[in-house]
């Protein structure tokens, strides 16, 4: 026989390797697969491994010029999903050499770039990734992290409080700054630009930054506490985004903000580097996440987006609430909250954690609870999220019948009451409403 045999071949001959022992340096992925009727699970799993690594639909002569064995992704395990018909979890191991160092963009392009449109699959969802220290060490990660942020703000032993300024679109810069001042003066730690506030005709970014900085310094002088406002630096180009971050630094404010999914991981990582080099904290909003993570059987779970963000860099990230207006299952939410802030997270399928993740010493990210929460949720939030979190009340502050500042006071008083009650050993789940009522007096 001459050369090699061309033609379409079964992926599972090369890419389904149940005997494979995973390496410490491999990136591991768990995919929830729904194969098309008549496609065996092994073939589907192998196809996923092939298409997201070295495979193509036919044998090519250039395969002879490289070592497939060294570079191919391998589907090393498949398990049926309990309670679902024709759904499987496929485990795939990728050799580290397939990925560019320090690039979340390249990691995602490789793992989820192409394979989700694959004909043999009806649906595919990336449930989790195991990032080996050999790879995570090539990333800077969060510009500062939880501990450094607490030291910069001089705030300890409690969750931090935030508030999104509403109405999100339409206020002039001067009135916007006024709303910021009232909230911070009332006792909040942070206020926030809404994710869609960038630089629109009714309020250009530079004017907003100036009036907000004035509000910050005034409220700081009056309360003796460090205050912040997440100035949204998200823009249409990376250059413009960095220009806004530079101006924020020149004003001397403590924190800026970015929409990391719409802005993109490349822009986000650039901004994170700038923030670390210039002492700015970085707040991350997850606008667009539900487009990717809402469907159970197709897309990417938020825990994958959360891991990607911790690598790319951010000091805060929105992470659902467990109690407010947006959906979130408690155990699963706490699973990715721990993936954001802890050093070492044990595999625990009941919390949706498919792999043990060791971040070594990469800084942690504050999870932000935001969306439809108000003062009566405070005991539950304090209990669920613990101290290392940011609790954000938009309408729950500005909707106070007496105005913004009293709304802010109410939130701060409720938080302090819950933290004190917890520290005294009271049961927040049972006595929550009572604790809030006492605090109202």
UniProtKB/Swiss-Prot annotation:
This is Ribulose bisphosphate carboxylase large chain. HAMAP family: RuBisCO_L_type1. One of its GO terms (molecular function) is magnesium ion binding. The gene is rbcL. Belongs to the RuBisCO large chain family. Type I subfamily. It is an enzyme of class 4 (lyase). The modification N6-carboxylysine is found at residue 192. The record marks 325 as: Transition state stabilizer. GO terms for cellular component: chloroplast. The lineage of its organism: Eukaryota, Viridiplantae, Streptophyta, Embryophyta, Tracheophyta. Substrate binds at residues 114, 164, 168, 286, 318, 370. The active site is at 166 (proton acceptor), 285 (proton acceptor). PROSITE patterns: RUBISCO_LARGE. Its cofactor is Mg(2+). The modification N6,N6,N6-trimethyllysine is found at residue 5. Its EC number is 4.1.1.39.
């Amino acid at each position: 026989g001459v050369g090699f045999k061309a033609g379409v071949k079964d992926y599972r001959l090369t890419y389904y390797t149940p005997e494979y022992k995973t390496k410490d340096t491999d990136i591991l992925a768990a995919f929830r697969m729904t194969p098309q009727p008549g496609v065996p699970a092994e073939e589907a799993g192998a196809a996923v491994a092939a298409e997201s690594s070295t495979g193509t639909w036919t044998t090519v002569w250039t395969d002879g010029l490289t070592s497939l064995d060294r570079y191919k992704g391998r589907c090393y395990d498949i398990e049926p999903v309990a309670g679902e018909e024709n759904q499987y979890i496929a485990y795939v191991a990728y050799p580290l050499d397939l990925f560019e160092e320090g690039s979340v963009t390249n990691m995602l392009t490789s793992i989820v770039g192409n394979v989700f449109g694959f004909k043999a699959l009806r649906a595919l969802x990336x449930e989790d990734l195991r990032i080996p220290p050999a790879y995570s060490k090539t990333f800077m990660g969060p510009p500062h992290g939880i501990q450094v942020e607490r030291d910069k703000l001089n705030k300890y032993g409690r969750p931090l409080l935030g508030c999104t300024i509403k109405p999100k679109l339409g206020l002039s810069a001067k009135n916007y700054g006024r709303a910021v001042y009232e909230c911070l003066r009332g006792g909040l730690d942070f206020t926030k630009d809404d994710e869609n506030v960038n630089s629109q005709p009714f309020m250009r970014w530079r004017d907003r930054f100036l009036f907000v900085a004035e509000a910050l310094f005034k409220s700081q002088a009056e309360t003796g506490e460090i205050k912040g406002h997440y100035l949204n630096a998200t823009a249409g180009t990376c250059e413009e985004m960095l220009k806004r971050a530079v101006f924020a630094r020149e004003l001397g404010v403590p924190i800026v903000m970015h929409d990391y999914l719409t802005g993109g991981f490349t822009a986000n990582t650039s901004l994170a580097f700038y923030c670390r080099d210039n002492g700015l904290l970085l707040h991350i909003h997850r606008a667009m996440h539900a487009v990717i993570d809402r469907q159970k059987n197709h897309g990417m779970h938020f825990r994958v987006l959360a891991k990607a963000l911790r690598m790319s860099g951010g000091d805060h990230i929105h992470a659902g609430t467990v109690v407010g207006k947006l959906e979130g299952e408690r155990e699963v939410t706490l699973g990715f909250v721990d993936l954001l802030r802890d050093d070492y997270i044990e595999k625990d399928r009941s919390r949706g954690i498919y792999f043990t993740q060791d971040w070594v010493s990469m800084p942690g990210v504050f999870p932000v609870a935001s969306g439809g929460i108000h003062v009566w949720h405070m005991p539950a939030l304090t209990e669920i999220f613990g101290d290392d979190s940011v609790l954000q009340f938009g309408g729950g502050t500005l909707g106070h019948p007496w105005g913004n500042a009293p709304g802010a006071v109410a939130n701060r008083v409720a938080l302090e009451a819950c933290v004190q009650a917890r520290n005294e050993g009271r049961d927040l789940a049972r006595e929550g409403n009572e604790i809030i009522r006492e605090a109202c007096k």
